[in-house]
Regions:
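N-terminal, motif-rich segments that launch catalysis or mediate targeting to/interaction with membranes
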Residues: 20-130, 140-260
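Structured alpha-helical
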Residues: 1
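Sec-dependent N-terminal signal peptides
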Residues: 4-16
Length: 260
């Protein structure tokens, strides 16, 4: 019997701090999934949809957040984020966080022909969501403010905690949608797209984390119009890059070259 070296069997995980954020919110996660599917061939789309069963790609992308109210899944609370003190680097550990879970899910999914369909579906649900989470900079942020959740801000058009502003409010206020995201995607240099497609979760995390100075570039807890305008562009870019990378994972696993 083959032993699976990496598995994501749903084991109880004990965490001392559970981040309360919902990266990108419902719309943002839907956009990541929709962008990814626009970049897949019909055959790969069909395979992925087959494993998702009765779930749409939008529902798959939001599943981890939708289940937050279900105590059965409390062990997943720490899987959405990673906290690193400012100026420090990530220290690999056995703890279940966004990096370790995403890496395990991607590795697990590559064995999809050898594992049960429900396990493939589980891996897809994790990957669809966590790729999105990883590209929200505050999910790779600082424990001191709980990824921006404890910082209250105001602005001409949005207000609340900094994390919620980045999750949903700028997306809603600026009307970021699939058409605008695909227009941005189509404007990218093909060489940049190829670079984005390389699967390396650690590099993805550091790229998101490099945006934290931009996230915190305000004074007196006030976000002026320039902040909102500039960071709407950053958010759109992050959503598109997340979609490109989700598509890359799916193509790498289920694409024609893999299966033919």
């Amino acid at each position: 019997m083959k032993k699976r070296l990496l598995t994501l069997s749903f084991l109880l995980v004990i965490g001392s701090y559970a981040n309360t954020c919902f990266a990108w919110g419902k719309v943002g996660h839907e956009l990541v999934a929709q962008i990814a599917f626009r970049l897949l061939d019909d055959s790969t789309q069909k395979i992925v949809k087959g494993y998702l069963g009765n779930l749409s790609i939008e529902e798959a992308a939001n599943w981890m957040d939708d289940e937050r109210g279900n105590s059965y899944y409390n062990y997943m609370r720490t899987w959405h984020y990673l906290d690193i003190d400012k100026g420090q680097n990530y220290e690999p550990s056995s703890e279940r966080n966004i990096l370790t879970v995403l890496h395990s899910a991607i590795t697990d999914l590559r064995m999809y022909k050898e594992i049960r369909r429900k396990e493939v579906k589980r891996d897809l649900l994790l990957i669809f969501h966590l790729v999105g989470d990883l590209h929200q900079p505050l999910h790779t942020g600082y424990a001191i403010d709980k990824g921006g959740n404890t910082i209250e801000v105001t602005s001409p058009s949005v207000s609340g905690n900094l994390h919620s502003v980045w999750d949903t409010q700028i997306i809603d206020a600026k009307g970021i949608n699939l058409d605008s995201c695909m227009a941005y995607h189509n404007s990218l240099n093909p060489a940049d797209v190829l670079a984005f497609e390389k699967i390396n979760e650690l590099k993805w995390m550091y790229q998101s984390r490099s945006l934290l100075d931009t996230v915190y570039s305000f004074q007196n807890n006030f976000l002026d119009q320039a902040y909102l305008d500039n960071n709407a562009k950053v958010i759109k870019r992050q959503l598109v890059i997340a979609g490109i990378r989700l598509a890359s994972i799916l193509k790498d696993t289920f694409g024609p070259k893999t299966n033919g």
